Curated annotation (Swiss-Prot):
HAMAP family: MurC. Its main location: cytoplasm. It comes from Lawsonia intracellularis (strain PHE/MN1-00). This is UDP-N-acetylmuramate--L-alanine ligase. It is found in: Cytoplasm.
Length: 453
């Protein structure tokens, strides 16, 4: 980055993607300021690292700043953004700053509608095992780091690429991963065709010597591959892929053989449950093999993987009740979480506390949400987490509850907020239940509160 850049201001600094970049910048010696709407453990961590952070977005927060970095959730009417533009201070999206960091390393960008965070974390773990010491920027807390970012001394930067606002097209990696392509983020994209076009552009953006590692089993990926003019390696469960898995065991622990380019590399043991995590592991193997990491290091790294925060995360037990927390907020992610829960806890009642995320997503996928949520044993449904979106008439959790009741007979109860859900837990849970707090908003807070009350 240009030596004239001294002080960086980050609007929405507490977000999962922004905070990781902030941590890397702090470790590189930059002066980092920022703001967010509320205190959090992430804010506290960044302050300890030296960041100066204000709570609330106010124009007077800006001082002598070289550049302003904005989260994708921050709109143009934000007073800090407006003042920066009035004073001619550059305002750039998060992905553009990530691109600047990527210029310092060889970039690996991991994209897809689902599975980005876990796949990025698995890839980082394999690179660590091989002694590559990568710089890593993730959208969740990698348990091995205790953080969502780390500045390494090696030549690679492994980053989660956010497709939600199209800004992932700014990145300049030499290796891309696409885990899947599904309908989402219709607050930005006007159609599924636009989403497909964005991913095609993303894959074609790698240099001529670069590589795309993509899930060959995914229908969305299959549709766009004929339009990709760069090199591609596919992975999946089908033997037609370049890299594929032969499942031995799929449950609390995943065991599978990996066949790459016709050669069996060996047996992988992965402690992350769920069939979807086998696919995530295959993506990590594909990237690792591409940069010359041995199959032995791949197998060892995956076996030592300690997981990611909020991805089917075990929180604890109380009175015979198991508490799991998961970030899933798209119907396909919810389905994967519930499928995993049924395999891990086959004879137990599954109670889900779900907080939908964004009005636009709930509207676009209303029917899909009704279908997948109707498969649980007991559903506690709270109001939609807006993520700075404005309400859409008729799109609310009460109507979602009614939609579920119209197609199933499951026990579903609506609660106006997460406090009401928390206070209801002692009355609806009993010994032997599995409580899953599910969603990308604030629902994550009620599990620990329940365990300690």
């Amino acid at each position: 980055m240009n030596s004239k850049i001294k002080s960086i201001y980050m609007v929405g600094i507490g977000g999962s993607g922004m905070s990781g970049i902030a941590e890397i910048l702090l470790n590189l010696g930059y002066e980092v300021h920022g703001s967010d709407i509320m205190e959090s453990h992430i804010i506290h961590r960044l302050r300890k690292l030296g960041a100066i952070i204000s709570i609330g977005h106010q124009a007077e927060n800006l001082g002598d700043i070289s550049v302003v970095v904005k989260s994708s959730a921050v709109t143009e009417d934000n007073p800090e953004i407006q003042l920066a533009r009035q004073h001619g201070i550059p305002v750039i999206p998060r992905a553009e700053m990530l691109t600047e960091l990527m210029r310092l390393r060889k970039g690996v960008a991991i994209a897809g509608t689902h599975g980005k965070t876990t796949t990025t974390s698995l890839t980082a773990t394999v690179f660590d095992t091989a002694g590559f010491d990568p710089t890593v920027v993730i959208g969740g807390v990698l348990n091995a780091y205790g953080a969502n970012a780390r500045l390494g001394q090696g030549q690679y930067l492994i980053a989660e690429a956010d497709e939600s606002d199209g800004s992932f097209l700014l990145l300049l990696p030499i290796i891309n991963v696409v885990t899947n392509i599904d309908l989402d983020h219709l607050d930005y994209y006007r159609s599924f065709e636009e989403i497909e076009h964005a991913f095609v552009t993303f894959m074609n953006n790698v240099p001529f010597y670069g590589m795309n590692v993509v899930c060959g089993d995914d229908p969305g990926v299959q549709r766009v591959l004929p339009r990709v003019n760069r090199q591609v390696i596919t992975y999946g469960f089908e033997s037609s892929n370049h890299i594929w898995a032969e499942i031995i065991e799929c449950g609390i622990i995943n065991r599978f053989k990996v066949i790459a380019h016709g050669e069996c590399l060996g047996e992988v043991i992965l402690t992350q449950p769920g069939k979807h995590n086998i696919l995530n592991a295959l993506a990590a193997i594909g990237v690792a093999l591409e940069v010359g990491i041995s199959p032995k290091c791949c197998i060892e790294g995956l076996a030592n993987f300690k997981g990611v925060g909020r991805r089917f995360e075990y929180k604890g037990e109380k009175n015979g009740i198991t508490v799991i927390d998961d970030y899933g907020h798209h119907p396909i992610e919810v389905a994967a979480t519930l499928e995993t829960a049924r395999k891990v806890f086959p004879d137990r009642r599954i109670v889900v506390a779900f907080q939908p995320h964004r009005f636009s997503r709930t509207q676009a996928l209303f029917g899909e949400f009704c279908q997948v949520l109707s498969t649980v044993d007991k559903l506690l449904l709270t109001e939609i987490y807006p993520a700075l979106e404005k309400p859409i008439p008729g799109i609310n959790s009460q109507n979602l509850a009614q939609g579920i009741q119209q197609i199933s007979k499951i026990d579903v109860t609506y609660y106006p907020d997460i406090d009401a859900v928390f206070h209801a837990l002692p009355h609806v849970l009993c010994a032997g239940d599995v409580l899953i707090t599910l969603g990308a908003g604030t629902i994550t807070t009620i599990g620990p509160k329940f365990l300690t009350c």
